[in-house]
């Protein structure tokens, strides 16, 4: 029987990875996804209730969350390391050291070069998945020794590069560019997206926004309800100084884009972003006047289930769709 490469690499039952989300994916969500057979991932500021610039405190909070996940499940899980640049790298270095000390099974590395922490993590026996946005970056990650790459299309929520390659185009490009396993994300919320991803050459899927709207998610109830109410054209791409972000359309995005259009200086734009950042939405419940990262799949989200039920329902539906697709393929025989 042919084994799925991501399942074999990570020791999981289903090739479904819950993407790390800032202020959202804490121990409860991570453990729930891992326990049901996928791979949960602790995101930045997991378990935090306020913004804390202290590096040591940030590292210790990550350690506490790792311990909490292990108290809830014995299944493999991942922790996100956002490499960053310049002064911000002091945070990622601390998180990386905690991962090594705690012998975390998997690290999902993003927002930075793949050669920064890969060697150290792998020497500690940690599997490394690196997030990229182009085939060229995927090749560089492979050369740096990562175990798998994660490609995210233009549909994806949150921060990404300035390229506008959609998941449908990016996935086969990356699959052709590297020999290591490929996980794809951006616009995937249900069994249809997973089926498409596998057909495009991916070994697994990376789902964020759909898991944001689950009971275990640390996202504020106001934000969850905003995503449930979201209609078809509900997100917008927001250009920032160093990268793009895809956000749920609200008063925040309208005002920010108006400031950009008016020619506001970079300092003013950055101050506005800081004053209306995701923390205000995810923990204070300001679903209108703060930034909410979201994929275009928000228009497909209609309920707030437990993460376990979500995964189980996706797998059950996926089996039906595989059978239906096999029937449809008979026309090509």
Task: Pin down the residues of each PLM region.
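Active-site entrance/lid segments in N-terminal catalytic domains of soluble metabolic enzymes
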Residues: 1-177
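Electropositive, surface-exposed helix/loop patches at the edges of structured domains
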Residues: 70-97, 183-192, 242-256
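Conserved active-site-proximal phosphate/metal-binding subdomains
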Residues: 161-183, 189-333
